[in-house]
Amino acid sequence: MPGNKGIVKRWRDAAPIFAKTGMADELDRLIQPQVTLKSGGYLIINQTEALVAIDVNSGKSTKEHSIEETALATNLEAAEEVARQLRLRDLAGLIVIDFIDMDENRNNRAVEKKLKECLKTDRARIQVGRISHFGLMEMSRQRMRASVLESTMSVCPTCNGTGYVRSPQAVALHLLRSLEEQLTRNSKFDL
């Protein structure tokens, strides 16, 4: 890109730039579903055909005095990380965030405010809903380009993208049923 001529500089170190700067590890983390938070909590990010589901878990995050305080602290930290991950992973479309349930309505509003604040620097068009009584927040984010997962991964030919393959027992039963079906179709063989 000619416009970047003054910005881009040639890498002269013997070590590869991605290894030296730690970018290779960062890129590997972008395709992992789990994102660990500093507090010990974590996010699980699942990108599906219909939507992106983000689950917030407290994990080892128990530094606060009560369950409500732990949930609030983890959710506030998660809101910040969710905004970051949306940009890094180029996640778009319908996004549902399952925050840790909190009893106090003001805490839900604080998490909503934090997420909206963190999303202000995002160039994509975003609509953010409110946290429901189930602890779910719906939002939509404009697709700027294909997500990191879509642009760097291909569908597994074994499971066709489900993430599951048949168990050995299920394979054996499937083979037996198929064999039985074939034998009943061909009357030469006696069962």
Task: Identify the residue ranges that each predicted region occupies.
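Conserved glycine-centered short motifs in functionally critical loops
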Residues: L37-L191
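Extended, charged alpha/beta regions that create polyanion-binding interfaces
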Residues: M1-T48
